Amino acid sequence: MKVLVVGTGAREHAICDALKDDVELYAYMSKNNPGIAKISTYKIGDEGEVDKVAEFAKENGIELAVIGPEAPLGKGIVNALEDVGVPCVGPAQESARIETDKSFMRNLFEKYEIAGSVVYKVFDNFDDIDKFLDEFDRDVVVKPVGLTGGKGVKIVGDHLRDNQDAKLYAKEVFETEMGGFAKVILEEKIVGEEFTIQAFCDGEHLVAMPAAQDHPHAFENDQGLITGGMGSYTDTDGLLPFLSQEDYDAAVAIMKDTLKAIAKETTPYKGILYGQFMLSKDGPKLIEYNARFGDPECMNVLPLLKTPMIDICKAVVAGELKEAEFEDLATVCKYIVPDGYPDTPHAGEIVEVNEEGIEKLGAKVYYAAVNEEDDGIHLSGSRALGIIAKGKTIAEAEEIAEKACGLVKGNVYHRRDVGTEALLQKRVDHMKSILDE
């Protein structure tokens, strides 16, 4: 079966890796990702030019496509591919609004009375924000409505000093039309521990994957700017050290209700639904949805998959999704990034990756924002590659991943604390202190 994967990063490399043994693999990517290039017939091009992607698919007789990144989903890539007869693991443009338009998501929760929502308000002029924040007595989160690559959200107490500071940032979002809209969402700040649940969806049925926890801050001990994610981990039981089965099930129930609401409001949602939750003293609260796999969380869950990925993909597009089986192992993923990231990254320099040594340790490497040229693999300005390891415990997986990171040479760094016992205990203690209040 001819399968096309659209996208350039480590997430797409992981998707390709999960499919490669069972399909004739094609890829459409914006840069020469060395990992994807090795295992596919590929074309370098702009993934956002959806008609050209559809033309490539038609010319090559593609029978199914898997869409990696969010931007092409927002531009209607699934609609374009389906118009030329290619079914997709990825939602149509209308349903992808669950990620591409945060006001659509919040309004959906309100209209269908879905659990796990937060106090929020959507603004289309600054004067109303000014008045609202003068009267609102809780800390807020400021969110652009559209896509910002995971870097547009700012939180009082983390990136912003107070609600007056939030006003200034909200004004910046308006004036620059950050995310493509002159709109801002203000939400109450929820205190707790973040976690992610990703799920396969066929429009009606939802199959949830193991929970993961991302580490968005650029530097160790949760310091620095918010990034697309510096690493993540999963545990052997599909839960997390601070996450109970009851809270996991409650989060999945929220996702199932969302799936039903999307079908009523737009078109049946077929693809990956990524729920980012905050576990609060009142249970899971939905922070946001993504309309695709997480990056890095995709790299945690797909290597655990026992059910062939292609079987799941075919079930998704056919509306016949039943189950997916995962190994009972823990995983730790650590992202290697250029020195200076995210502010002033060292782009263009060569990074040396000892793939053979990494594999001997039992780890995997998934290439992200790099470009392979004749003289080697060059860094760009973003995350370079993900190192993923499995183990019988999180500690075992972390030890393997950390050793593997030492086999990447260049002007790069990574968060050594991702998956460590000290950081996990910090998460557990934090959650306990919230529940004990």
List each model region and its residues:
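Active-site "cap" helix and flanking loop/linker of ATP-utilizing ligase/carboxylase catalytic domains
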Residues: A251-Y274, N290-K360, E372-E373
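Short, well-ordered beta-strand elements within core beta-sheets of diverse protein domains
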Residues: R383-G391
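ATP-binding N-terminal substructure of ATP-dependent carboxylate-amine bond-forming enzymes
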Residues: M1-E94
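Internal nucleotide-binding/catalytic subdomain
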Residues: K154-F293
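Active-site nucleotide/adenylate-binding loops and adjacent lid/helix of ATP-dependent enzymes
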Residues: L4-V5, E99-K183, D237-D257
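A cross-kingdom feature marking charged/low-complexity
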Residues: V418-E437
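Short arginine-rich
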Residues: E177-G179, K403-V418
